[in-house]
Structure formats: structure tokens, C-alpha cells
């Protein structure tokens, strides 16, 4: 999924899964109708959407319900995406790369969301405070 992103600095993908079915997907990139250029001089443009936000807003425009679903995402969610995840009813988040800040993880855990770090190069572990 991440390879669909036009962003050069970092490509992130997200899948929302419920009852073993993919109900939404997203990747980081510019809003619909904008040019597919995410950076200016290697700095990410402020209006670039994160993969999680794209997957969740895509769900909002569909007939699917994310209550109780699992989000699989390339990198651990930032705090802004964590807020969207909490509000969307997603109950589990699995990620493969650590983001430089962990405030999003802490917020999701505080909300009772199960957060798992799953990296094929490292031993799998559930993150808990």
C-alpha cells in the first residue's frame, strides 16, 4: 500500500480490516485534486494527509463501519492520527516502523486501543505502559 504514495521522503500505507475483510485503505499524499507532489525542497507540504487519515476519511464516505476494526499501518501513528483512530472506533493498531514521537501510541493506549509493534526484522511485542 505504501508504494502507492507519491511522497519521496517517506511512504506510508494503511489498511482497515474488519471481520477478516479490508474495508478501507489509504496512503500518505496530497488531497484529491491537488498535484501529486508532497515535498518542497525536501520539506513535506503542510497539507499532505497521513495514510491513517486518508483511510479513515475514505471510510466516512462509504457504507462501512470501522467500529471494532484493526488498523494496519507502516509507521506508528502521530497524535493527530491517534485522535482520528480513537474517534473512528478502531480497537487495534498494528504498525511496523516506530515514529520518532510516541505520544500517539500513548494516547491510543489511554483510550483502551490495543497497540502492537510488528516488525519482521525484530521480535514482535505488544506495547504497554
PLM region descriptions:
Residues 1-129:
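Zinc-dependent deaminase catalytic domain
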Amino acid at each position: 500500500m505504501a508504494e502507492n504514495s507519491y511522497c519521496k521522503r517517506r511512504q506510508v500505507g494503511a489498511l482497515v480490516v474488519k471481520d477478516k475483510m479490508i474495508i478501507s485503505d489509504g496512503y500518505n499524499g496530497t488531497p484529491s485534486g491537488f498535484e501529486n507532489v508532497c515535498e518542497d525542497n525536501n520539506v513535506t507540504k503542510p497539507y499532505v494527509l497521513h495514510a491513517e487519515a486518508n483511510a479513515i476519511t475514505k471510510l466516512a464516505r462509504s457504507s462501512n463501519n470501522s467500529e471494532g476494526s484493526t488498523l494496519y499501518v507502516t509507521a506508528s501513528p502521530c497524535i493527530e492520527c491517534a485522535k482520528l483512530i480513537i474517534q473512528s472506533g478502531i480497537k487495534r493498531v498494528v504498525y511496523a516502523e516506530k515514529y520518532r514521537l510516541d505520544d500517539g501510541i500513548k494516547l491510543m493506549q489511554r483510550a483502551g486501543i490495543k497497540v502492537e509493534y510488528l516488525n519482521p526484522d525484530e521480535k514482535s511485542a505488544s506495547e504497554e505502559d
